């Protein structure tokens, strides 16, 4: 295939896919200023942090990138214009922002502006407690005001870091408030990571009914946003959807999250002593499980594993789906998908839908074979291996 590196191929499942060849490209520093938007929200500020490193990273971005967006256009142009450098050194622009006097001297866009991705990542890695993570939405809001676009690799890192620290709801709120935060679901990896964590929190509760229903609502909310909210659409997403051949809201890998949680709820259908409301919920769970399973097998080609569903071109570029070919990453996402297929097949089979169960088993067998190849390539103790062993193998 043209443009594809033949060397260092990593084979996972039935395809040969290119291995990572270099570090992710850093987003270039922005060399132009944007006209400030009307302040419809409070001015971005940050809470007390747990470390001086985090405070420095946040304040650097606030002073150099965020606060200038609140200046009137003519003053903003002035502080970035070199011909006013000496004048501003003696007489800086002083303006009240959110009731506080702010002083602006000349800012050289090439040498004075911080590297946005580097500083955001530094801030993210320095966040330790709830107070630190509470600054995340304001940080992204400020970057959105300044038209700083997150590099392709950073959004999924934000989801992973915050959710690992227990802040799934913070991420979901940023997605809901996308107009303010600019935190979009435009990249395949970001969506995959978010759906993984929603399921993981339900799994950690042993799929208790309240937590599983809550998780199912959150997954459906994500799917609805992917289908109907144009703010989560972009050129990058359109390209990735063309490479996968699925719009995000119909991508089988994403729909498997809904199937997984619905299967866990439907498995409770035979519990005795249910109230009339619980019986109605159980009947709806069973009905939805059959509906979601039928939809999934229509979209998911027979005999195809996860990687085989998408085009070869999807795995060429780092900005697209190459992340999926890393064995331990593949195992993390495949674990809940495989659990969904197996559990759903078992339940619909018990309900008398034999042909549908057989189709689910067909997809499960393909995913399991692919996952076993990935499992053999990871070192003992790696995160992907542990997740796979716990979710699929039932290991505690």
Curated annotation (Swiss-Prot):
<dbReference type="GO" id="GO:0005739">
    <property type="term" value="C:mitochondrion"/>
</dbReference>
<keyword id="KW-0496">Mitochondrion</keyword>
<comment type="similarity">
    <text>Belongs to the mitochondrion-specific ribosomal protein mS27 family.</text>
</comment>
<comment type="function">
    <text>Component of the mitochondrial ribosome (mitoribosome), a dedicated translation machinery responsible for the synthesis of mitochondrial genome-encoded proteins, including at least some of the essential transmembrane subunits of the mitochondrial respiratory chain. The mitoribosomes are attached to the mitochondrial inner membrane and translation products are cotranslationally integrated into the membrane.</text>
</comment>
<comment type="subunit">
    <text>Component of the mitochondrial small ribosomal subunit (mt-SSU). Mature N.crassa 74S mitochondrial ribosomes consist of a small (37S) and a large (54S) subunit. The 37S small subunit contains a 16S ribosomal RNA (16S mt-rRNA) and 32 different proteins. The 54S large subunit contains a 23S rRNA (23S mt-rRNA) and 42 different proteins.</text>
</comment>
<protein>
    <recommendedName>
        <fullName>Small ribosomal subunit protein mS27</fullName>
    </recommendedName>
</protein>
